[in-house]
Amino acid sequence: MAKDTNKTVKVRLVRGLRGTQSRHRLSVRALGLNKLNDVRELKDSPQVRGLINTVHYLVKVEE
């Protein structure tokens, strides 16, 4: 059976970036999130999952 390559994941920025590490701010920007409560629908890939794991305390993930 072939893998479903169209899987996506919704990511929402739920906490502000003040007081966070610069690496984490860059990870949030790489996910395409700019302002509080921004939502992006991204392709579910290991790279995106790694960025989400880095900033798990700032974002909310909806499968």
UniProtKB/Swiss-Prot annotation:
GO terms for cellular component: cytosolic large ribosomal subunit. Pfam families: Ribosomal_L30 (PF00327). GO terms for molecular function: structural constituent of ribosome. Keywords: Ribonucleoprotein, Ribosomal protein. GO terms for biological process: translation. The keyword Ribosomal protein applies. InterPro entries: Ribo_uL30_ferredoxin-like_sf, Ribosomal_uL30_bac-type, Ribosomal_uL30_ferredoxin-like. Part of the 50S ribosomal subunit. NCBIfam families: rpmD_bact. Belongs to the universal ribosomal protein uL30 family. This is Large ribosomal subunit protein uL30. The gene is rpmD.
